[in-house]
Amino acid sequence: KKIDTRTGKTMEKTEKKIELSLKNMKTAT
């Protein structure tokens, strides 16, 4: 996938945060 240096970095961070929150939700349930 293409990554814009400025927005790409923030997108990656948010993606990782979403992944972590999803994992947390799965483990919580």
From Swiss-Prot:
It comes from the Bacteria. Its main location: secreted. One of its GO terms (biological process) is defense response to bacterium. Keywords: Antibiotic, Antimicrobial, Bacteriocin, Secreted. It is found in: Secreted. This is Bacteriocin. GO terms for cellular component: extracellular region. Thermostable. Activity remains unaffected even after incubation at 100 degrees Celsius for 30 minutes. Has antibacterial activity against strains of L.monocytogenes, L.lactis, B.subtilis, S.typhi, S.aureus, C.perfringens, E.aerogenes and M.luteus but not against E.coli, S.sonnei, S.pneumoniae, S.faecalis, P.aeruginosa, K.pneumoniae or P.vulgaris. The lineage of its organism: Bacteria, Bacillati, Bacillota, Bacilli, Lactobacillales. Activity is stable between pH 2 and 9 but decreases at a more basic pH.
